[in-house]
């Protein structure tokens, strides 16, 4: 989905700290001219301060993960469970490992995705 009648499509790849902040901000304002899609393996985030405790055996991996279903709903995001296989910057399209594609007007992604940009 690209811009239709003034509506822009923002696609966020992953649920890291920066994207969680974006979702929090959008949950407060819910712009009518924005369609939001989040692509990540699961609707949860790893709480990085707990990783040392996980490595030391004090926490399970499940205890280190924060569910984000509520935040996704409040922000109006459409959640897509998947991983990215390619980002075509020229065509403004993300291809998922499943073969599905998602078009975007604006794209948010972490540096770890640079290896799939064409």
Residue ranges and their predicted role:
Residues 1-7, 76-118:
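FAD-binding core/adjacent interface of flavoenzyme oxidoreductases
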Residues 2-78:
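Beta1-alpha1 glycine-rich phosphate/pyrophosphate-binding loop at the start
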């Amino acid at each position: 989905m690209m811009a239709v009648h003034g509506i822009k499509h923002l696609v966020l790849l992953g649920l890291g700290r920066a994207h969680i902040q974006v979702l929090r901000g959008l949950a407060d304002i819910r712009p009518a001219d924005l369609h939001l899609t989040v692509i990540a393996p699961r609707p949860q985030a790893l709480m990085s301060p707990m990783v040392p405790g996980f490595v030391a055996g004090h926490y399970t991996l499940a205890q280190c993960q924060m569910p984000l279903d509520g935040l996704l709903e409040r922000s109006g995001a459409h959640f897509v469970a998947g991983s990215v296989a390619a980002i075509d910057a020229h065509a403004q399209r993300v291809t998922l490992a499943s073969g599905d594609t998602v078009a975007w007007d604006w794209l948010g992604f972490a540096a770890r995705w640079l290896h799939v940009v064409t």
